């Protein structure tokens, strides 16, 4: 059976705003309190999805979560009508209101870790919801994600859904943003590469300025849940020094597709040993690693972070070459653009660039790779996916019109307490669940 890497992009939610909630994510803190444009943000994401679908790539859509999360506020002691809860939290805990209104679920690379059936002992695709323990505004996503994913991948014969790991410091898990797969054809076994920032039960190198969000113990637990072969699994520590420069997830400093790993030279601790280990394991699959290492002398870590050069999508083309999807910021930076221009003019695997304006997401710290969850599927598994979430020209028009109808074109912090915004969001999401045939996946629908 043929295999595909299918990208499931998150739709930006109606409460997209700049709150500076993500310590360690420098774009998030830099743009705190700016006025956002949720309508533009959603359209920028949709345009990227459509462009890639038009190129022939399999493209799916994942819906935003309900925000503000009134149910979370009630668990924290706020009571009364929904309007009273909003008024009370806005008056007495405004930062909390911002956190429970975050549209961060748009970054579906953090929704879950996914292992293809070719790598799992039971021959099924495994999903483990990420607990996102390190940040409150993200940790509250896990409960709804655990309902949404089975509504999309809703065939028990092909898909296995695991709950998030216990939400404790020892098991901090950030999902696919710290996970890569290296091999040949998508429907053949490959090497799964889990990247962690620290060890929870043993001493070792750790960052000093910013938190390491992913633990080795969490990555190991996910690998066990997914029934992966230890001979085809590697656990790699990210360089603590780059975490302290704003590389809060590995997808800010590395990206892979098939046998190609594109990364900064400072991305990993003990990089030479890491590459040797991967090469050895890939040789067992009769595959050869193509390692594209970007020197610090050509692109600094600071420039990589500010432009999200590595938070790109690396896509395989029919001619065997690779396409790199990058944000506008990468083109705007002279040193990054110089490097990329030389890269695609050479004889390496990457021979094409596609530039997208994703500034609304970028200002909150999420580039092209953040916005998508990669799911490797064979033909039978693709047919088992909820077909209504797969992007078609007709669905693009429907979603674009849906955004025009429901989204505001500017949002400030004071707007989060507006009860009309809550109702606008619920009305929009209720309609979206019908468009995507998801059923009652949101708390307001189930209560």
From Swiss-Prot:
EC number per UniProt: 3.5.3.23
GO process annotations (BP): arginine catabolic process; arginine catabolic process to glutamate; arginine catabolic process to succinate
- Gene Ontology molecular function, alphabetical: N-succinylarginine dihydrolase activity
Q: Which InterPro entries does the record match to this protein? A: AstB_sf, SuccinylArg_d-Hdrlase_AstB
> Which chemical reaction does it catalyze?
N(2)-succinyl-L-arginine + 2 H2O + 2 H(+) = N(2)-succinyl-L-ornithine + 2 NH4(+) + CO2
Q: Which UniProt keywords apply?
A: Arginine metabolism, Hydrolase
Which residues of the sequence carry a binding annotation for substrate? 19-28, 110, 137-138, 213, 251, 364
Instruction: Copy the pathway line from the protein's UniProt record.
Output: Amino-acid degradation; L-arginine degradation via AST pathway; L-glutamate and succinate from L-arginine: step 2/5
Q: Any S-S bridges, and between which cysteines?
A: none
In this protein, the active site sits at: 174, 249, 370 (nucleophile)
**Primary role:** Catalyzes the hydrolysis of N(2)-succinylarginine into N(2)-succinylornithine, ammonia and CO(2).
The text of the family note is: Belongs to the succinylarginine dihydrolase family.
Q: How does it assemble?
A: Homodimer.
Q: Which PANTHER family match?
A: N-SUCCINYLARGININE DIHYDROLASE
Protein's UniProt name: N-succinylarginine dihydrolase
